[in-house]
Amino acid sequence: LTTLHQRGALIKVHGGAAAAESETMTRDADLSLRSTLNKEEKAVIGKYAAGLIREEDFVYLDAGSSVDVMIDYITETGALYVTNAVSHAQKLLKKGMRVFLIGGELKAVTEAIVGAEAVEGLKKYHFTKGFFGTNGADAVSGYTTPDITEALVKEKAMQQCRKCYVLADASK
């Protein structure tokens, strides 16, 4: 997988790989566009996911529009939150939550913090729960994202979680 990824033939993701040939697999949609899609489904998913958080939890919140909607429903102020999304950190802070933002490169299109520094920073955390977005889901490839720098952050964050939840609507 690593060799094929280095050649650009596939994109490595947690649990597998995705084809690198299609246009949709090589580009991220702008966050402002993604936040307008499938609002009702994301609201149902987000409300359910937020209800899984307990006071004693140490929670990782991945960047993305589905997790952004989830934050609207988070009420647990006793939990501790870590994220790789500046917008998520700001929303949590406004709600009175204690939040940490990992370091790294800020990616303009998705507003996610990515890169080697982000991956390295995640190593010091051990989360009870993690909530993740995805660009796609496939029975063969698993969960996919078109950007290797985001995939590596997701992979490391998932490794650091006791329980992982992927928030995905039917369009994935």
Give, region by region, the residue ranges found by the protein language model.
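HTH-adjacent hinge/linker in prokaryotic transcriptional regulators
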Residues: 1-60, 71-80, 93-97
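Conserved phosphate- and dinucleotide-binding cores of soluble alpha/beta proteins
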Residues: 2-5, 12, 87-172
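Short glycine/serine/threonine-rich phosphate/pyrophosphate-binding segments
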Residues: 66-70
